[in-house]
């Protein structure tokens, strides 16, 4: 084994890259480390593409091993299970900047596996994994236009911080990850506390400039450890077939893209393609239909892009900066705690908000420890939303990613747990989709939360932007359609309110996107965002003052800490019976604070009353209605308060002499008893005799009513 190591300084951290020792049978492997956080990244690439392969099969797997943090997995099997949400998001984070750097026509299967083998809680493994992936691909010899660098940028005390630690991030107004080559930014993922467009763009450029140290180091590492470059050539293009397809389909494609309705346009394109295939196969039975399909798609792209660059109207007839028609409705579902239907053109989201208690919070067992998630946002993209059939079930990577992006957009305006002590779950059901569904989810989530009465600081809106660039000309597109997303050069999504940005996600497919272009795109996005916010605020200007009648209400009571055990009971028996009998949820804090949650206030009041009884102290001289719990030779034990019994001595049962307790009392009888004494050991002495004496007061001189006379007789 001949290890090759590269070490360099990256801001406040030291990065180490090593190859040649571990996983030597992979096409390439790199052990990347930053301050005790270590990720093993392997790349395996097949030398030949599978026959008939018509897409690039790149797979990225990111896995966190619990041994990396010195922990043993929970559960029966004591093994790592399905990928966590964080692992899925990190897979996407790695995939997005590397995918555009593989050449067109490269169809060989490539698998990247990043395994976290050691973790320092202060250093997030995602940046380490990105750097390791870049290094492994660079030394592998596969056709890859890298290396790339990656950086996390924070804002602490209004200063940019490169790769902040976990402690620094807690005080940061920004958590931004940027990746790119030496010439261009390729990917941005961020969450912000209402920062301006200039601050966000400054962070992107700061990170891109800082990552040049990584790119330089990986280039040097590749020169020393890199394998021989693959002798791969892109398949030669069939120019005669291109010419033929242009003749057969160009006019039909052009006419189809004058159709503003998505379904109608798709139908026309399918018809043009079918006619093209018929004519091609009539002339040559052996024509390559897969290649024909690619050429047809490229022709679509050329036509749409050239029209946009020429200043013509967009696919659906809009100007570049125009937002589609917006429709907003709140309170659309009768029994949910909050709901909204947000429609923008042919994109629609049905969003609900549900309020729960702390018991409903999500407990996440991460490498760095247990975390409690009290705000969940889930995004669902069923096949019917694009008029297709398909599998319906657990969320895919894309759905998890879009849900997290929408959550980032909303997080900055959410109230603290002290201000609003509820667990909140928002679900966005995409019911129609033609571009920008994640940003529709941001808008719908804001509306649903306000409809539920959640005191968010302001409305939040999101917008998806696109870019078409040809040579020195470029056009920025607001509120892009699905087709414009596929055919454009940049896709970026911005969420925020009137004061600033809460989330920014950017994916750039080409070089040459300058700071000026990104600046103008962000300015255009702000204008679109403010327009959407105006429409939303007209529908619901702020959160509702009253919660839904179906939402739980909290009632709080404080008890002595030494009384907590009385409310819980042995094995939780008391609190279990209490919640079941009153139809409530009860949560007890270590400081003795008890929160009772109930949809019906009467249920909450009943639970509070029972808790008061459970935690009340027995008072000397007070008369209680006690229940006989046990009879002994020398008296009876009577329960005066839940869990608190006292002894009525045989001499205190009646005025006359009592020889047999059973002649006067039986188990279950409810009798008045007076507390005579509580001794040093906490034992309670009771008296039925004195309770009866106190109860017998002189009758009034006025004649008693007949009913009252009967009652007096019964008492005697």
From Swiss-Prot:
SUPFAM superfamilies: Eukaryotic type KH-domain (KH-domain type I), Nucleic acid-binding proteins, Polynucleotide phosphorylase/guanosine pentaphosphate synthase (PNPase/GPSI), domain 3, Ribonuclease PH domain 2-like, Ribosomal protein S5 domain 2-like
Positions of the S1 motif domain: 621-689
GO-annotated biological processes: mRNA catabolic process; RNA processing
Predominant subcellular localization, coarse grouping: cytoplasm
Pfam families assigned to the protein according to its UniProt record, in alphabetical order: KH_1, PNPase, RNase_PH, RNase_PH_C, S1
EC class: transferase
Compartmental location: Cytoplasm
Ranges annotated as biased composition (Acidic residues): 707-716
Positions bound to Mg(2+): 485, 491
GO molecular function terms attached to this record: 3'-5'-RNA exonuclease activity; magnesium ion binding; polyribonucleotide nucleotidyltransferase activity; RNA binding
Recorded GO CC terms: cytosol
Needed cofactors: Mg(2+)
Catalytic reaction equation(s): RNA(n+1) + phosphate = RNA(n) + a ribonucleoside 5'-diphosphate
Compositionally biased residues, Basic and acidic residues: 689-698
Family per record: Belongs to the polyribonucleotide nucleotidyltransferase family.
Subunit details: Component of the RNA degradosome, which is a multiprotein complex involved in RNA processing and mRNA degradation.
NCBIfam families, alphabetized: polynuc_phos, PRK11824.1
Main function: Involved in mRNA degradation. Catalyzes the phosphorolysis of single-stranded polyribonucleotides processively in the 3'- to 5'-direction.
Protein's UniProt name: Polyribonucleotide nucleotidyltransferase
């Amino acid at each position: 084994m001949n290890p090759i190591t590269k070490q360099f300084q990256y801001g406040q951290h030291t990065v180490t890259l090593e190859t040649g020792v571990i996983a030597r049978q992979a096409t390439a492997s790199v052990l990347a480390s930053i301050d005790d956080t270590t990720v093993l990244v392997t790349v395996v690439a097949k030398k030949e593409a599978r026959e008939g392969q018509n897409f690039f099969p790149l797979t990225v797997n990111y896995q966190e091993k619990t041994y990396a943090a010195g922990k043993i997995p929970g559960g029966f099997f004591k093994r790592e299970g399905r990928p966590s949400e964080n692992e899925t998001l990190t897979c996407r984070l790695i995939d997005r900047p590397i995918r555009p750097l593989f050449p067109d026509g490269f169809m060989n299967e490539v698998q990247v596996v990043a395994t976290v083998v050691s973790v320092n809680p202060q250093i997030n493994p995602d940046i380490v994994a990105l750097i390791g992936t870049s290094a492994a691909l660079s030394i592998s010899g596969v056709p890859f236009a890298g290396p790339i660098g990656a950086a996390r940028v924070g804002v602490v005390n209004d200063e940019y911080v490169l790769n902040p630690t976990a402690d620094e991030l807690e005080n940061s107004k920004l958590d931004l990850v940027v990746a790119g080559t030496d010439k261009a930014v390729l990917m941005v993922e961020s969450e912000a506390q209402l920062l301006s467009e200039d601050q966000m763009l400054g962070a992107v450029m700061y990170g891109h400039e800082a990552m040049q140290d990584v790119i330089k180091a990986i280039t040097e590492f590749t020169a020393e450890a890199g394998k021989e470059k693959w002798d791969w050539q892109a398949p030669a293009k069939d120019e005669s077939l291109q010419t033929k397809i242009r003749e057969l389909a160009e006019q039909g494609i052009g006419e189809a893209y004058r159709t503003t309705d998505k379904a109608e346009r798709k139908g026309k394109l399918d018809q043009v393609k079918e006619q093209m295939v018929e004519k091609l196969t009539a002339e040559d039975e052996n024509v390559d239909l897969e290649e024909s399909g690619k050429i047809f798609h490229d022709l679509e792209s050329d036509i749409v892009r050239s029209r946009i660059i020429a200043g013509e109207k967009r696919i659906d007839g809009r100007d570049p900066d125009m937002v589609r028609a917006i429709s907003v409705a709140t309170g659309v579902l009768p029994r949910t705690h909050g709901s909204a239907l947000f429609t923008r053109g042919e994109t629609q989201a049905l969003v609900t908000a549900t309020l729960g208690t702390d018991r409903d919070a999500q407990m996440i067992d991460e490498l760095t420890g247990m975390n409690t998630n009290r705000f969940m946002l889930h995004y669902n993209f069923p096949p019917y939303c694009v008029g297709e059939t398909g599998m319906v079930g657990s969320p895919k990577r894309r759905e998890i990613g879009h849900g997290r992006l929408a959550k980032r957009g909303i997080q900055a305006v959410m109230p603290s747990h002290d201000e609003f002590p509820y667990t909140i779950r928002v679900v966005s059901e995409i019911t129609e989709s033609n571009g920008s569904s994640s940003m529709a989810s941001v808008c719908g989530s804001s509306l649903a939360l306000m409809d539920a009465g959640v005191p968010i600081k302001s409305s939040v809106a999101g917008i998806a932007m696109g870019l078409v660039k040809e040579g020195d000309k470029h056009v920025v597109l607001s509120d892009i359609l699905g087709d414009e997303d596929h055919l454009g050069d940049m896709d970026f999504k911005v969420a925020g309110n009137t004061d600033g940005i809460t989330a920014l996600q950017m994916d750039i497919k080409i070089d040459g996107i300058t700071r000026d272009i990104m600046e103008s795109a962000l300015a255009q996005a702000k204008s679109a965002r403010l327009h959407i916010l105006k429409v939303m605020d007209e529908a619901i200007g702020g959160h509702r003052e009253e919660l839904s009648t179906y939402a739980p209400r909290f009632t709080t009571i404080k008890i002595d800490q030494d009384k907590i055990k009385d409310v819980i009971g042995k094995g939780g028996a008391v609190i279990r019976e209490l919640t079941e009998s009153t139809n409530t949820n009860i949560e007890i804090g270590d400081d003795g604070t008890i929160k009772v949650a109930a949809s019906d206030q009467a249920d909450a009041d009943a639970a509070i009353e029972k808790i008061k009884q459970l935690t009340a102290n027995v008072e000397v001289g007070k008369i209680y209605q006690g229940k006989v719990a046990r009879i002994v030779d020398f008296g009876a034990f009577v329960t005066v308060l839940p869990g608190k019994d006292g002894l009525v001595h045989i001499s205190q049962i009646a005025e006359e002499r009592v020889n047999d307790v059973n002649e006067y009392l039986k188990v279950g009888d409810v009798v008045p008893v007076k507390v005579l004494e509580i001794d040093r050991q906490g034992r309670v002495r009771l008296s039925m005799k004195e309770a009866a004496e106190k109860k017998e007061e002189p009758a009034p001189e006025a004649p008693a009513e007949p009913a009252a006379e009967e009652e007096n007789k019964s008492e005697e």
